[in-house]
Regions:
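Catalytic-core elements of nucleic-acid end-processing and repair enzymes
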Residues: 1-366
Length: 366
């Protein structure tokens, strides 16, 4: 099928055209200990909160992701990619670069899942390291790693996983596009495809929206593979994956890590950010009938001891000219088609759409 051919442009129901990589027919997710619930970071922050609080927490997460997009747009390769190759999947990028979202990571590469199931993230260095004896023996749950597995025809939007979803929407006048935060896309896996920043395709990444979906532990579409952790296994996998570089590459965006972490904790937003959250975040319109209602509620909220504020002007996260040049130097000059196979398969209307995006971004075809 053409949909399984790497380099094919596919239009997704969330409104993005993505360039696919080859499908391996299976989905995996690795976790380095047993958890009671495997849920996206946003859902974990909403646990135990009222529906009112959950809506505000969601709006803040969406605004932070939007600010992330505005920041990375300063990097030459990001607007160029959107102008010439495919749409930027900001939610997937935000998920892979440390922002709270309603998305859960999956991969179609077993080794990638095994790496995440046997190694530990180091927040200080933004990298992974092998498990130590202390890590493994910390609790009864940390003695075991878990890998979730499902055939991709069960979950994949491109390979049968969307059949029931399409049947339910045959007579639905709302044809989308659908926000990940709407709940309409829950429980299906979507290929992230190739993106200008590298983590997503290095990890053969898929995302599963879980705004309302059940935790993986209770999802009978997944089998759960539990194994005993050991330092020997962890070190062996760590070395096999080139100390994590094969799936967690050291790239230009890492030079702005401090800025990304500032955005991840942001409490000051623009009116444009708020409008985006109100619309794209699918804020409950019965609870907040107008954007003014949302503004009033969210500015009364404290996050980590600080009140949220909304201002008219855009929030700028400055980066020095030299630092930005260093980042650009790591991306500019690369043949962006190399990793794709030097060919993009697309329909004429998709090519026309890309040309229009180029004109929107640069004012002309380049």
């Amino acid at each position: 099928m053409i949909k399984n051919t790497g380099g094919t442009v596919i239009s997704m129901p969330f409104g993005k055209n993505i360039i696919t990589f080859n499908s391996n027919r299976h989905f995996f997710r690795g976790e380095n200990q047993q958890y009671l619930k495997s849920l996206p970071s946003l859902r974990r922050k909403q646990e135990g909160k009222s529906k009112y609080e959950c809506e505000l927490i969601k709006a803040i997460a969406v605004m932070r992701s939007f600010q992330f997009l505005k920041f990375i747009w300063k990097i030459d390769v990001v607007p160029f990619w959107e102008a010439k190759l495919s749409d930027i999947n900001i939610d997937a990028l935000a998920q892979h670069y440390g922002f709270d979202t309603c998305l859960l990571d999956l991969t179609n590469d077993f080794r990638t899942a095994l790496f995440f199931a046997t190694c530990k993230y180091d927040y200080k260095t933004d990298s992974y390291r092998p498990l130590t004896k202390k890590d493994i023996e910390a609790t009864e749950n940390s003695k075991y790693g878990v890998i979730f597995h499902s055939p991709n025809w069960v979950l994949d939007y491109l390979n049968g996983g969307s059949f029931e979803w399409h049947m339910h929407r045959l007579n639905n006048p709302d044809k989308g596009p659908y926000s990940f935060y709407s709940g309409y896309l829950g429980g299906m896996a979507f290929q992230i495809g190739y993106q200008p920043l590298m983590r997503c395709h290095h990890q053969s990444g898929y995302i599963m929206p879980m705004m309302n979906a059940t935790p993986l532990q209770n999802d009978n579409r997944f089998e759960k593979l539990r194994f005993l952790q050991s330092e020997e296994l962890s070190n062996r996998v760590y070395e096999m994956m080139d100390k994590g570089k094969k799936i967690f590459p050291h790239e230009g965006i890492g030079k702005s890590l401090d800025i990304l972490r500032t955005i991840q904790k942001a409490v000051i937003f623009s009116e444009d950010d708020l409008l985006y959250a109100y619309d794209y975040g699918v804020v409950d319109k019965k609870m907040f009938p107008t954007i003014d209602n949302l503004r009033k509620a969210i500015t009364a909220l404290q996050v980590d001891g600080k009140f949220v504020s909304i201002q008219k002007d855009e929030i700028d996260y400055p980066i020095s000219t030299s630092a930005l040049q260093e980042i650009n130097d790591e991306y500019n000059g690369r043949n962006l088609l190399d990793v794709i196979g030097n060919m993009i398969h697309q329909y004429p209307e998709q090519r026309w759409y890309r040309e229009q995006r180029c004109i929107d971004i640069y004012g002309k075809l380049i």
